[in-house]
Amino acid sequence: MEGSSSSMQSKYKGVRKRKWGKWVSEIRLPNSRERIWLGSYDTPEKAARAFDAALYCLRGNNAKFNFPDNPPVISGGRNLSRSEIREAAARFANSAEDDSSGGAGYEIRQESASTSMDVDSEFLSMLPTVGSGNFASEFGLFPGFDDFSDEYSGDRFREQLSPTQDYYQLGEETYADGSMFLWNF
């Protein structure tokens, strides 16, 4: 039985078995020592499918896949970031249960991609339009924030805080400039 487990480990590229029985997948970036962690899966086939999806994103459709009869089809695959590659790999690996042919997995990916676009546009529409129209005078959630901007801006503010005053007055005592120290006993 142990012999079959070791043969399963070497059966798929980019897949290995953990001590506790989970199958994990990771892929090395081209011309780099860095790797992208693709996740842990219940079966070696799911982990291998995740590897295939990441391989497609990094190398294109001419790469040597674990399942050459069922290659992944990921729109915009060559232009994805690491986190997007990780997400596409997980999606492709978990779509294996639903599709016996390659087409159903593609439809699932397209659905979830369009759903995420809807959520993003919905989220963006909920944000306040800070600064639209009158730029700095409108602060959305912080009304009145800009009420004092005229009093403390420009030359008038610089004159009020001018370092040219030659004395500082504390209570009844007046100190000449520079003679007051913190530890002067």
Curated annotation (Swiss-Prot):
Q: What does UniProt give as the signal peptide span?
A: none
Q: Which is a GO BP term held by this UniProt record?
A: ethylene-activated signaling pathway
Mind listing the GO molecular function terms for this protein?
A: DNA-binding transcription factor activity; transcription cis-regulatory region binding
Which ranges of the sequence are annotated as binding DNA? Answer: 11-68
One Pfam family cited in the UniProt record for this chain: AP2
Which CDD domains did the record assign?
Answer: AP2
GO CC annotation terms, alphabetical: nucleus
Q: Where in the cell is it found?
A: Nucleus
Q: Does the keyword Kinase apply?
A: no
- What keywords were assigned to this record? Activator, DNA-binding, Ethylene signaling pathway, Nucleus, Transcription, Transcription regulation
The entry's function note states: Probably acts as a transcriptional activator. Binds to the GCC-box pathogenesis-related promoter element. May be involved in the regulation of gene expression by stress factors and by components of stress signal transduction pathways.
Task: Tell me which family the UniProt entry assigns to this protein.
Answer: Belongs to the AP2/ERF transcription factor family. ERF subfamily.
Q: What is this protein called?
A: Ethylene-responsive transcription factor ERF017
Species whose genome carries this gene: Arabidopsis thaliana (Mouse-ear cress)
- Gene assigned in the entry: ERF017
